[in-house]
Regions:
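RNase H-like (RuvC/DEDD) metal-dependent nuclease/polynucleotide-processing core
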Residues: 1-285
Length: 285
């Protein structure tokens, strides 16, 4: 199996203008490749290549995949916001046309990768794509790393934590946030960042080792953007790999065309999400 995280350039102003990033993880949790793609067709072609001669591929796309609402926010976004997890605010009106994610789903379908709201854990020979939220995953990993995920008032701890700000701010604050995110990834059980075949050159067209980069305010915003996409792609790939392994806890909030998101969640966080889903009559599994 291969697990592909896609940091999609989906936001208004960047969709179809900026490149997206793909990060590939094997069954052991090792990052074996990454690349950059400019269009939905290119992304689907890369995914098809990564899955060739493999027993399936799971793709986690870090972008809203199902956007049924003309304006406002999706129900799953309101659930995450109540729990103080970062949520993408998406409506059809903000895109002014077909969202890039819908174009991507159509291209992935052409290469045999189907949209799902629940990829099956521990099952090979499946080719599916699911929505993930890299910012929420990063916050959950930070919570788990601190040991606070199962102790005390979870809601209070989440509200007290700052949301990751990898994209906004000056170069000093962005570089500091990126260094913190990379450190969390380095310490995440089940994820191996450094695998020997990746480069420390941020300008390399593919296979960049994010753990070897000297991230600093001396970099340009464009270079920092490139690192952000590598980090987000890694978080997306980790999310689907963690779910597939079925050991450390995960949860799907929402269902089908109404929008759903796959999150790392165990015990206390899972119970908190389930409580909010029950109150809002939002499906979860």
């Amino acid at each position: 199996m291969r697990f592909v995280g896609c940091a999609l350039a989906w936001r208004p102003g960047e969709a179809r203008e900026k490149v997206s990033c793909l990060v590939v993880i094997d069954e052991r949790g090792s990052i074996i490749a990454n690349s950059f793609a400019a269009s939905a067709e290119d992304i689907a072609g890369a995914v098809e290549g990564y899955g060739t001669d493999r027993r399936g591929v799971l793709v986690g796309v870090d972008a809203p995949l199902a956007v049924p609402n003309e304006r406002g926010t999706r129900r799953i976004e309101r659930i995450l916001s109540k729990i103080a997890l970062p949520a993408y605010s998406a409506s059809r009106r903000m895109f002014g046309g077909e969202p890039l994610a819908e174009e991507l789903l159509a291209e992935l379908q052409k290469v045999g990768v189907e949209y799902t709201d629940y990829p099956f854990p521990r099952e090979r020979d499946q080719s599916a794509v699911v929505e993930v939220d890299s910012a929420a995953t990063l916050k959950v990993l930070s919570l788990e790393r601190s040991g606070a995920a199962e102790n005390g008032d979870l809601a209070q701890k989440l509200r007290a934590m700052d949301d990751p700000k990898l994209r906004k701010g000056n170069k000093e604050s962005r570089a500091a946030a990126l260094r913190g995110a990379i450190e969390i990834l380095w310490d995440t059980p089940g994820l191996r960042l450094r695998t020997g075949n990746l480069s420390s050159d941020i300008a390399a067209p593919e296979n960049v080792d994010v753990s070897k980069l000297d991230v600093s305010a001396e970099m340009s915003h464009a270079e920092l953007d490139r690192i952000v996409s590598l980090v987000e792609g890694t978080l997306a790939a980790y999310t689907v790999h963690r779910h597939w392994r079925g050991r450390d806890g995960s949860m799907v909030v929402g269902a089908g065309d109404e929008g759903s998101v796959l999150l790392p969640a165990k015990n206390a966080l899972r119970a908190r999400l389930a409580e909010e889903c029950g109150t809002a009559n939002v499906p979860y599994v």
